[in-house]
Curated annotation (Swiss-Prot):
DNA-binding transcription factor that specifically binds heat shock promoter elements (HSE) and activates transcription. Promotes thermotolerance by transiently regulating a subset of genes. Induces expression of STI, SSA1, SSA2, HSP78 and KAR2 during the heat response. GO terms for biological process: cellular heat acclimation. The lineage of its organism: Eukaryota, Fungi, Dikarya, Basidiomycota, Agaricomycotina. PANTHER family: HEAT SHOCK FACTOR PROTEIN (PTHR10015:SF427), HEAT SHOCK TRANSCRIPTION FACTOR (PTHR10015). This is Heat shock transcription factor. It comes from Cryptococcus neoformans var. grubii serotype A (strain H99 / ATCC 208821 / CBS 10515 / FGSC 9487). The gene is HSF1.
């Protein structure tokens, strides 16, 4: 008796392969390409079922298309749960890839938007739209969520989370593995009702309670034939390409009973994974906050460093400007490019950036090094005061503002020039020494260097605009020249003073000058009007920064020549003092003072045969009396008038330019003679076996040009040794023969004889003269 297969597992109602699944009905099998079973029953003439199945399989590629059932590798009929069947269909549908789709490897599937997936896709296949229920069903069938960090995991405002689920038997293109997906259940399995049973034995995943198995048990006579037919059908199916068949049966309720092994808690493993992820995210957020804090601190520190670097650069620039101003001022002050100024530049550059210690140790060291060879304390003080006032005095023209003194120490003060402070620096035009017959190479000593000339004042045609509007005029007669000339009496501009001199202020004025160089004018006969442009102005300082230049323009002289002459004398204060005193005691100076002040016995009748120191001290006393303003107008004569020898008038200056140049040449020759005379005295003293004292004294012989030499001795040395007294003592002894040494008419050679007898020495020195 043949058994019809439809009588065992046939559908309760015919199914159409082209039917569209309703949202709440069981979907068709994923293997839609498999052909259905033949509609005709088996051969009624007694043909075996195995032959029929074999022929059908070999001819048409037989497949079993019952939904919910499948045949495993052993040919056993296995039921696929409806949930897995629906899930496989949803994931494989390309129309809903925006809601659920396979992974790249096909081992898992993704749900990009859980909320949208539960609202739109779940109601089509299930009776609910709760995504949490869907996740619980996946957990029951052994699916697990794949944890991973998304790009926006560190931000709380991310509303969408990408869900990924995987199962080792749920893969793309392999629906036959769905039979190995088992369902977890907390209830103990029952071996009786609902136990697994199969036609040929228990399967790997447990048997299935099917109507075909119960029908086979009821009809025991046909069980062998059914088992043989299914086995043959399985063998025929091995020749097909797929090898697995799903038997669709919409009437099969429920799912297969679970195996004897009980599953653990369903949610616990997933909860542990989520807590680990949350803790990791919290740690990452904390680290991110710490990094952000450190980054803000680093940015603030970077800004502070840049600001400090900018401030340091600005301060360095101001210091450089200050150093340049100081060096340029000192260059104008000293008027030299020698080694002394270079050393001063280097010392200033090294000292600007160094902050002195509070105890002044570094300042003391620098002062000791600077004055190591200086034994005179008063000279130290004068040099220090000169440098301080040189810095405080501002620019060379006396109109600049004073810079700020930053250092609290009075010894080393740094000049800090702010952005608001302005320095009025006079422009300097250096004249070449080769433009005049008197070049620097013709000077007798290396210390006689040219001073820089300042900008010339306005033209001499406008006398009212020159700085000499308030200069006084005086009238004197030069008896040596034998002619009466009108001369002016301005005090020479001595802007370029040495800081080693005794002059206290750098820029003398009526309030701070060593002596107010003022006098009651004696108007010339040609212009007796006191209200003229050359009238006396007591408020006008005679020593101004541009006095030398103004005087040169007033007399149509070369400013470089006048400044060269005066600067050559003022480079060495001792030489300048000796020169002024020599001129004051000269014959022409006596004639000048006797003509201007006939009632002054100290100036009219100096004793040429007596001690020269008495005459010099008397002249100095008159000068001091004039500076203090206690004397009358007859005592206000400036000894520097002797520099203009012969003293020219403003009107006849053009015709007397040759005489003026000759006077300048004589002045330079005097300096050379002083040096030669000093060398002669030194050689004389050494020849006598005496040691030269530190202070040293000099004996100067001056010849004003007419051949009459006047010997003057200045005892300005220390108290231990006086050359004048020594020579007078030698004269009183009267031993030896008198000798006389003639002095050449050019005035460029003067010497003293060093005979065997000491009586000659005094006469040689007294009769030495210069032309």
């Amino acid at each position: 008796m043949t058994t019809n297969l439809y009588a065992i597992a046939g559908p309760s109602k015919p199914t159409t392969p082209t039917s569209t699944p309703s949202p709440r009905s069981e979907p068709p099998s994923p293997l839609k390409s498999l052909t259905s079973l033949p509609t005709n029953p088996l051969n009624p003439q007694g043909t075996s079922t195995s032959n029929a199945l074999t022929n059908q399989s070999s001819s048409t590629g037989i497949g079993i298309s019952k939904p919910g059932l499948s045949v495993d590798e052993n040919g056993e009929v296995m039921k696929v749960p409806a949930f897995l069947n629906k899930l496989y269909t949803m994931v494989s549908d390309p129309e809903v890839d925006d809601l659920i789709y396979w992974g790249e490897n096909g081992d898992s599937f993704f749900v990009p938007n859980a909320e949208l997936f539960g609202r739109e896709l779940l109601p089509r296949w299930f009776k609910h739209s709760n995504f949490s229920s869907f996740v619980r069903q996946l957990n029951m069938y052994g699916f697990h969520k794949v944890p991973h960090l998304q790009s926006g995991a560190l931000k709380n405002e991310t509303p969408i989370e990408l869900w990924e689920f995987a199962n080792p038997y749920f893969k793309r293109g392999q629906p036959q593995l769905l039979t190995k997906v088992t369902r977890k259940n907390n209830r103990l399995s029952n071996s009786g009702v609902g136990s697994s049973s199969s036609l040929g034995g228990s399967g790997a995943g447990g048997g299935m309670n099917t109507r075909s198995a119960s029908a086979a048990a009821a009809s025991g006579s046909g069980s062998g034939q059914i088992q043989q037919a299914i086995s043959q059908g399985h063998e025929a199916g091995n020749h097909s390409t797929s090898g697995k068949y799903l038997i669709t049966d919409g009437t099969t309720p429920g799912s297969a009973p679970p195996s004897h092994t009980s599953a653990g808690p369903l949610i616990a493993p997933q909860t542990l994974d989520l807590s680990a992820i949350n803790s990791g995210i919290a740690a990452i957020r904390q680290t991110q906050a710490s990094i952000a804090t450190d980054l803000r601190k680093l940015q603030a520190s970077n800004e502070a460093l840049w600001r400090q670097a900018y401030e340091t650069q600005e301060k360095q620039r101001k210091h450089e400007e200050t150093i340049d101003l100081i060096v340029s001022f000192l260059e104008r002050l000293f008027g030299t490019e020698g080694e002394g100024l270079k050393g001063l530049k280097e010392a200033m550059r090294r000292g600007v950036g160094v902050r002195r210690d509070r105890d002044g140790r570094e300042g003391r060291d620098s002062r000791d090094a600077r004055f190591a060879d200086d034994d005179d304390g008063g000279q130290k003080k004068r040099r220090r005061v000169g440098l301080d006032r040189m810095i405080e005095g501002g620019s060379g023209d006396g109109t600049g503002e004073h810079g700020e003194i930053e250092s609290p120490s009075s010894d080393d003060r740094l000049v800090e020039i702010g952005s608001n402070s302005e320095y009025s620096i006079p422009s300097v035009k250096r004249t070449s020494s080769s433009s005049h017959p008197l070049s620097l190479g013709q000077l007798g000593s290396s210390r006689f260097t040219a001073l820089p000339s300042e900008d010339p004042s306005p033209s001499g045609s406008g006398l009212g605009s020159t700085p000499y509007e308030g200069l006084r005029t005086t009238q004197a007669s030069a008896h040596g020249a034998g002619a009466d000339v009108n001369v002016t009496d301005p005090t020479l501009g001595m802007n370029h003073l040495s800081p080693l001199s005794d002059t206290d202020p750098l820029l003398p004025s009526s309030s701070n000058a060593l002596a107010p160089y003022t006098s009651h004018p004696s108007f010339p006969s040609s212009n007796p009007n006191p209200s003229s442009a050359w009238a006396f102005n007591p408020s006008q300082p005679l020593l101004s920064p541009t006095s030398a230049v103004a005087a040169a323009h007033a007399y149509n002289l070369d400013p470089s020549l006048l400044q060269t002459t005066i600067g050559s004398l003022l480079q060495s204060p001792a030489v300048a003092q000796m020169f002024l005193k020599s001129l004051s005691a000269s014959a022409q100076g006596q004639a000048l003072t006797s003509h201007s002040h006939p009632h002054n016995p100290s100036l009219l009748n100096p004793n040429p045969n007596g001690n020269a120191s008495t005459s010099a001290s008397a002249s100095a006393h008159d000068m001091n009396t004039e500076g203090l303003g206690t004397g009358s107008g007859t005592k206000d004569l400036d000894p520097t008038l002797a520099l203009f020898s012969p003293l020219p008038s403003h009107s006849s200056l053009a015709s007397q330019s040759n005489d003026l140049l000759k006077s300048y040449n004589d002045a330079l020759t005097v300096g050379e003679g002083v040096d030669n005379l000093q060398e002669s005295i030194d050689s004389l003293v050494r020849s006598m076996g005496l040691d030269l004292p530190n202070g040293g004294s000099s004996s100067v012989g001056v010849d004003v040009g007419d051949g009459s030499g006047v010997g003057t001795g200045t005892g300005e040395g220390d108290g231990e040794f006086n050359v004048d007294e020594f020579l007078q003592g030698l004269a009183k002894e009267g031993e030896g023969e008198e000798g006389e040494r003639e002095v050449g008419g050019d005035g460029d050679a003067s010497s003293s004889g060093a005979g065997a007898e000491n009586g000659r020495k005094e006469d040689v020195i007294a009769q030495s003269g210069l032309k």
